[in-house]
Amino acid sequence: MFDIFTRVVSQADARGEFISSDKLEALKKVVAEGTKRSDAVSRMTNNASSIVTNAARQLFADQPQLIAPGGNAYTNRRMAACLRDMEIILRYVTYATFTGDASVLNDRCLNGLRETYVALGVPGASVAAGVRAMGKAAVAIVMDPAGVTSGDCSSLQQEIELYFETAAKAVE
């Protein structure tokens, strides 16, 4: 996992070049948006339990067969595993948001996750629906204008939405 700064330096070093002015401008923008990024991660972290719980409630309301006898989330153990997995995905989305780099999400969370779910008989479409519900809830919390750094957060919103969509597609 590299943060955006390490990645830019590594790429320039590999090419034997100085960091280009366009890369420097992009890094300046990241620094300028650092407070917004930190606020977003803080909000997702502080509301992680409600994000996961509400997404799970929505998923099970939309797909009640999951919690019916014989369903993939039937029994407390399976339900707990489902909630744990949703929480792990959310945690890695916060890491990606904080660093501005999806590699931590892809490499340490999503890599091989679909294959694991297939092997366990977990319906990927249901997991994806839960992840998308978490994404909507997280973005709503992040974009709530009360008590955060003012300014345009649309690019950060799109980035967070992309991380959740990447996670959803990885398990479908």
Swiss-Prot record:
Q: How does it sit in the membrane?
A: Peripheral membrane protein
Q: What does the entry list as the binding residues for (2R,3E)-phycocyanobilin 1?
A: C82
A GO-annotated cellular component: phycobilisome
Span of the signal peptide: none
Principal localization reads: membrane
Task: Please tell me where (2R,3E)-phycocyanobilin 2 binds in this chain.
Answer: C153
Recount the PTM note: Contains two covalently linked bilin chromophores. The chromophore on position 82 is added by the phycocyanobilin lyase CpcUS, while the chromophore on position 153 is added by the phycocyanobilin lyase CpcT.
Task: Name the keywords, alphabetized.
Answer: Antenna complex, Bile pigment, Chromophore, Electron transport, Membrane, Methylation, Photosynthesis, Phycobilisome, Thylakoid, Transport
Give the N4-methylasparagine positions (modified residues): N72
One Gene Ontology biological process: photosynthesis
- Tell me the compartments it is located in: Cellular thylakoid membrane
What Pfam families does the record point to? Phycobilisome
State the similarity comment: Belongs to the phycobiliprotein family.
Complex and partners = Heterodimer of an alpha and a beta subunit, which further assembles into trimers and the trimers into hexamers.
Q: Please give the function described in this protein's UniProt entry.
A: Light-harvesting photosynthetic bile pigment-protein from the phycobiliprotein complex (phycobilisome, PBS). Phycocyanin is the major phycobiliprotein in the PBS rod.
Query: What is this protein identified as?
Result: C-phycocyanin subunit beta
